[in-house]
Amino acid sequence: MKDLMQALLTAALIACVPAGAQNVPEIRFDSVANALQLPADIYLGEVGGVATNSRGDIFVYTRTGHPTITIGTARPFAHGGSRLFEFDRNGKFVREVGKDSYGFMFAAQVRVDPADDIWVVDQMTNMVMKFDPQGRVAMLLGRKAEAVPVPARASKGDGSGQQSDLFDRPTDVAWDAAGNIFVADGLGNARIAKFTKDGVFVKSWGKKGTATGEFANVRSIAVDAQGNVYAADGGNKRVQVFDNNGNFKTAFPNVGNAQALCMTKGANQVLYVSNSNPPNDIDRDGEIYKMSLDGNMIGKFGRAGKLPKEFGTVNAIDCRNENTLYVGEIGNLRVQKLLLH
């Protein structure tokens, strides 16, 4: 009976692995111990985002802090539920950026652009905030719901693909070589919005659905050197690829529940994709795939779990260095520094 149960469990686990990923080579890797040195009075919560700048400084946007909620005439005003920390390249704590910001409530992602500006995506305030390297707010996209009624457009979407510069639970941000800004308006609206480098809305594409060009959700996005946009359509278990204007090009179907994407720099770009289940799901899958930009699997590493070299819902990957990754986890409340061999 015990042998039968073990066989059934093994078969079930194999069935959970995406078909195209079952024979992918394993990439050897290590997890660096104590990669981030936190002060005694600071802790990480669920890690929405992790990113590095050109100097190697590390930024972590985490769901921790002390939310402040004030009941207004019609809606609550809330802020402070997430915090943005900076560490130097050796993992030593440097500072907190944007403390008590109006736009910080539920950390979705942090990215650093080619000019070392820091971009924060917040899922609850429906805002994307750009900070300059000194930590000053330089641009805002989206709009938070007002604490009192005002004549304003609603940010709530119905997933129908409406053309709007407002968001409903955005998840990620990326840029092309010309500086155009792409926002994954991923959970409420299931679309990708394009803005000029000055923050002027251009267009959006996508809506709720399962057909080509539609999304169950857009968990993460990345842009390659040619300006193509890659979207992690986790609910539909695929990565979709579009040109710079939102025209569908192709899809990668064998990536499991695609949650986090990261595009490397340089001439020979590769894409990292996390196959992550929600934190309350069973401990299965959890690996990260390394892929060529034509969708071929180069290798994979890691699995679901709580130990070093295991992952608990990877929501963010930083791959400025192709073989030195920072991985932010929701389920394990941590950032791991990984060295790939």
Specify the residue positions occupied by each region the protein language model found.
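Eukaryotic scaffold repeat domains enriched in small/polar residues
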Residues: 20-341
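N-terminal secretory signal peptides that target proteins for export/translocation
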Residues: 1-3
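Bacterial N-terminal signal peptides
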Residues: 6-16
